[in-house]
Design a protein with these regions (language model features):
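Charge-rich, well-structured scaffold segments of protease-associated domains
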Residues: 14, 25, 71-221, 228-230, ...
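Short active-site-proximal "capping" loops at secondary-structure junctions
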Residues: 28, 39-43, 416
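Short solvent-exposed loop/turn micro-motifs enriched in small/polar/acidic residues
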Residues: 4-7, 78, 231-233
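N- or domain-start disorder-to-order transition segments that initiate the globular core
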Residues: 1-32
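His/Glu-based metal-binding/catalytic segments typifying zinc-dependent metallopeptidases
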Residues: 25-26, 34-40, 220-279
Length: 429
């Protein structure tokens, strides 16, 4: 067993079997929150199995060795605890929250679920039907349609191209045996980070985790994600005709991963453009020009290069103007149109929101476990804030010129409105 950062408020330990344990002592409330991260997620799915990790998350808690779904639920609810599974592009997550007195009992239950799920056939089929309903529902939502076609243009054969749900074809193909195989492959101690925050002591918590998980061992080398990353950035446009009351206009760019030196600059640009009522897009395109029902920007934190997206919901007759307006606002960033005061405001906003996102035990357990599973280490909490503060206007403009040159364009709306908006004169699309 190796231990590091002994003076930190976050204590990091690596068990002999490879499990990383993070413990944060926070006695202010009689609550313990735990996040168990698995190095899995959609990046570890074959294209023909898209949705597999999502289905596994839905079925994982529906049965384990000698416990049915009902018995698991009763054990959790009898002490007022919570336990749930979720998945993302870069990791799988099991979350639990209890009062301190019940922490050991619920952690032992979580270990049984994580290590020995039974994946009952009836539960697999039920969750598949629910997932298929969700997929069909997404196919009726203009925003979801626009985002999915944007991701597919940007990422091509990379797993980020697909929705976490997959599609009807891939979800229909999935079987219980696929869940068993995936679980056996990726759910292994050297692929796991356990992050715990609350009214606990470091020594007792590590001893408990060692007792519960210490006899779990891996037999082979850990598997790697399935990348197939697009080699070339080749902006294009795509439209879906749909009888809607508004058009969805979405522009996307292939940005940088969280490990890139440009990550902080792109985070600030996204905040400047689309975070809140004072953001550039909201003020210029909604308040001043009245073009937008909804307008924003987002740039998620990803292990591999993330998409940088600006979007707007607008009246059908404004579709063409909306495309030009969004495009022009992003283009301005490459033309030195970013003031020092605006960048400072974006820094204050992002750091303020970041601080507010680390108040509860659940938030603390989440953020440090997330950084660890991405390979950033818990010190990224400090580094991220330093990186944000260090970004200059020249850095931000340089990042815009490198990553935000020409967008992929995704449109959803009435045929006449969308057709009028394409092609895009003067932009070479």
């Amino acid at each position: 067993m190796t231990t590091s950062l002994p003076k930190s408020t976050i204590h990091r330990t690596v068990l002999n079997n490879g499990i990383v344990v993070l413990v944060t002592e926070n006695p202010s409330a009689d609550i313990v929150a735990t996040r168990i991260f698995v190095r899995a997620g959609s990046c570890y799915e074959n294209r023909t199995e898209a949705g597999l990790t999502y289905l596994l998350s839905a079925v994982l808690t529906k049965g384990c060795d000698n416990l049915s779904s009902l018995e698991i639920a009763e054990q959790i609810e009898s002490v007022g605890a919570s336990l749930s599974a979720d998945t993302s592009a870069d990791y799988f997550l099991l979350s639990l929250k209890t009062v301190t007195a019940d922490f050991a009992e619920i952690l032992r239950l979580a270990a049984r679920i994580l290590r020995n799920p039974t994946f009952p056939e009836a539960e697999v089929e039920l969750e598949k039907r629910i997932a298929l309903q969700d997929i069909r529902s997404q196919q009726e939502q203009p925003f979801s349609i626009a985002f999915e076609q944007l991701q597919q243009m940007i990422y091509q054969k990379h797993p980020y191209a697909m929705s976490a749900l997959g599609d009807e074809f891939t979800m229909n193909r999935l079987k219980r045996e696929d869940l068993v195989r995936y679980h056996q492959t990726y759910f292994r101690p050297d692929n796991i980070v356990i992050s715990i925050a609350g009214r606990v002591t470091i020594a007792d918590t590590i001893a408990l985790v060692e007792e519960v998980f210490g006899d779990w061992h891996s037999l082979a080398e850990p598997p790697q994600p399935i990348l197939n990353f697009p080699i070339n950035v080749e902006p294009q446009h795509k439209a879906t005709y749909k009888q809607t009351q508004q058009s969805i206009v979405m522009l996307g760019y292939l940005g940088a991963s969280v490990i890139s030196a440009d990550y902080a600059a792109l985070k600030l640009l996204s905040t400047y453009l689309g975070n809140g009522l004072s953001s550039r897009l909201f003020v210029e395109l909604r308040e001043k020009r009245g073009l937008a029902y909804d307008v924003s920007a987002f740039y998620p934190t990803r292990l591999f290069p993330a998409s940088f997206v600006v979007y707007m919901g607008t009246a059908p007759e404004n579709t063409k103007i909306a495309v030009a307006g969004l495009w022009a606002e992003v283009d301005l960033l490459c033309r030195n149109q970013l003031e020092e005061d605006a960048l400072t405001a974006a820094k204050n906003k992002i750091l303020g929101q970041y601080a507010l996102g680390k108040q509860t035990n659940a938030q603390i357990a989440q953020i440090y476990g997330w950084y660890e599973i991405l390979g950033l280490g818990i010190d990224f909490d400090r580094k991220f804030q330093e990186q944000i503060m260090a970004v200059s206007t020249a850095d931000a403009i340089a990042a815009a010129c490198q990553y935000l040159r020409e967008p992929y364009v995704s449109l959803v709306g009435q045929e006449d409105a969308v057709t009028t908006a394409m092609p895009f004169p003067g932009h070479g699309v």
